[in-house]
Amino acid sequence: MQRLKKFIAKREKGDKGKMKWNSSMDYDSPPSYQDVRRGIFPTAPLFGMEDDMMEFTPSLGIQTLKLQYKCVVNINAINPFRDFREAISAMQFWEADYSGYIGKKPFYRAIILHTARQLKTSNPGILDRGVVEYHATTQGRALVFHSLGPSPSMMFVPETFTREWNILTNKGTINVKIWLGETDTLSELEPILNPVNFRDDREMIEGAAIMGLEIKKQKDNTWLISKSH
């Protein structure tokens, strides 16, 4: 009987040892910080990571938009505009306290710049009342080259902007109504930014800068919107 008790006790002790060994095999120890760093690369950079371990979003490069547009501009001024520069300086106020579609804003600027060259006085005699009226309407389809990133979806719906403007010796009001949408036409289109519509390249570049656009000439002589401030 004494031998039997010793045998059972010895066997139980051996079973516990086996269970302990099996337990260490069934459950791996948690990975160390170094293991995680080596096996998983987060999209956000970690302090101390090498540049070649970081993830970057690829640039979309130069994009081409086919746009359908219509722009109607009406401006009142207490004095006639002396030159194109003064006219465009007044027109830039159309976007004061801008509350329209953010993604469309750079392209609105390009279209309004294009329309500015078409300004005409409504009635020269109206100056007798201390106000000069200018108006211009443009519409059609055109190309826009840009490197501003992803283009927004654009539906051909109108937006209206009415603002007061004041530049040194002149002031008045401006009203802009503009439609802008994409088109899938297969017809050949002219670029909206074209020096042919201006006195020269310099006038177009300066006008774009006043409107908040930085434009650059490409190798094929087309003009690219590189920045919108």
Swiss-Prot record:
GO terms for cellular component: host cell cytoplasm; host cell nuclear membrane; membrane; viral envelope. A motif (PPXY motif) lies at residues 30-33. Signal peptide: none annotated. InterPro entries: Vesiculo_matrix, VSV_matrix_sf. Its main location: virion. It comes from the Viruses. It is found in: Virion; Host endomembrane system; Host nucleus membrane; Host nucleus. It is a peripheral membrane protein. One of its GO terms (biological process) is viral budding via host ESCRT complex. Phosphorylated by host. A motif (dynamin binding) lies at residues 2-4. A motif (PTAP/PSAP motif) lies at residues 42-45. The keyword Signal does not apply. Keywords: Apoptosis, Host cytoplasm, Host membrane, Host nucleus, Host-virus interaction, Membrane, Phosphoprotein, Viral budding, Viral budding via the host ESCRT complexes, Viral matrix protein, Viral release from host cell, Virion. One of its GO terms (molecular function) is structural constituent of virion. Forms a double layer around the helical nucleocapsid, the inner matrix layer binding to the N helix and the outer matrix layer binding to the envelope glycoprotein. Plays a major role in assembly and budding of virion, by recruiting cellular partners of the ESCRT complexes that play a key role in releasing the budding particle from the host membrane. Condensates the ribonucleocapsid core during virus assembly. Late-budding domains (L domains) are short sequence motifs essential for viral particle budding. They recruit proteins of the host ESCRT machinery (Endosomal Sorting Complex Required for Transport) or ESCRT-associated proteins. M contains two overlapping L domains: a PPXY motif which interacts with the WW domain 3 of NEDD4 and a PTAP/PSAP motif, which interacts with the UEV domain of TSG101. Homomultimer. Interacts with viral nucleocapsid; this interaction contributes to the virion assembly. Interacts with the viral envelope glycoprotein; this interaction contributes to the virion assembly. Interacts with host RAE1-NUP98 complex. Interacts with host NEDD4 and TSG101. Interacts with host dynamin. Interacts with host NDUFAF4; the interaction inhibits viral propagation and is independent of interferon activation. Interacts with host GTF2H5; the interaction may inhibit host transcription. Interacts with host DRG1. Interaction with host CTDNEP1. Interaction with host ABCE1. Belongs to the vesiculoviruses matrix protein family. This is Matrix protein. It comes from Chandipura virus (strain I653514). The lineage of its organism: Viruses, Riboviria, Orthornavirae, Negarnaviricota, Haploviricotina.
